[in-house]
């Protein structure tokens, strides 16, 4: 979220600590339920009390942090995809072997972009939609949950065969297991997102994961 601590966020107007991806996902998913209780409410984390008492509003810094962080992830993935096309790589003298590895990175970036849109769909129900084909700085159309669901599903299904097999990638990089887990989570709540249950599809992805050798 920054290189020099909470006071140097790469998101304007947002403290880096309030927009750390894993933190805000956990806060919004858990502190808003009875799964976790904050033992003190008078600390420095403004907005925690409102989350766990379900009295938050649009000014809550964790909601702003989550939305902004997810949209930044979309923007970063889009820019990586713009800068790593075969045409750009050829013009920069990148070897054929390196281009093959970069193509895998491109598909991983698409999966991370799908993750960001998943959280926007899940937490907010809508978001501005942009891909690498849109000009930088242009506000995209607002997509609702059904549109975001369709994009996430089609994107993950398209790139799934191109990702590395489960547990074969470098540490810290995603693989087919990531894509299947995100598909499973998307299908699990499909009835909420699009009004159509997809439990069979969810179970199929979970079965693939279970049989992937994880312990």
Question: How should these model regions be labeled?
Answer:
Residues 1-108, 112, 117-123, 128-134, ...:
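Short acidic-aromatic linear motifs embedded in glycine-rich loops, typified by GG[WY][YF]DAGD(H)
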Residues 121-123, 128, 167, 189-195:
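Short coil/turn linking the two alpha-helices of tandem helical-hairpin repeats
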Residues 191-192, 203-215:
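Polar, glycine-rich mid-to-C-terminal structural blocks
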């Amino acid at each position: 979220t920054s290189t020099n601590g909470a006071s140097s966020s790469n998101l304007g107007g947002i403290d880096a600590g309030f927009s750390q991806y894993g933190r805000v996902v956990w806060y919004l998913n858990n502190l808003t339920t009875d799964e976790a209780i904050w033992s003190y409410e008078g600390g420095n984390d403004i907005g925690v009390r409102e989350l766990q008492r379900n009295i938050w509003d649009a000014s809550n810094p964790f909601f702003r942090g989550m939305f902004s962080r997810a949209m930044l992830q979309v923007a970063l993935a889009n820019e990586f995809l713009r800068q790593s096309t075969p045409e750009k790589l050829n013009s920069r003298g990148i070897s054929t072997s390196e281009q093959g590895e970069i193509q895998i990175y491109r598909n991983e970036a698409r999966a991370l972009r799908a993750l960001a849109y998943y959280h926007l769909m899940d937490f907010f129900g809508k978001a501005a939609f942009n891909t690498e084909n849109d000009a930088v700085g242009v506000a995209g159309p607002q997509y609702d949950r059904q549109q975001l669901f369709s994009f996430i599903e089609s994107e993950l299904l398209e790139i799934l065969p191109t990702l590395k097999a489960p547990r074969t990638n470098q540490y810290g990089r995603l693989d087919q297991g990531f894509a299947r887990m995100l598909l499973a989570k998307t299908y699990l709540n499909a009835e909420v997102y699009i009004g159509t249950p997809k439990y069979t599809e969810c179970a199929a992805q979970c079965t693939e994961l279970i049989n992937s050798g994880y312990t």
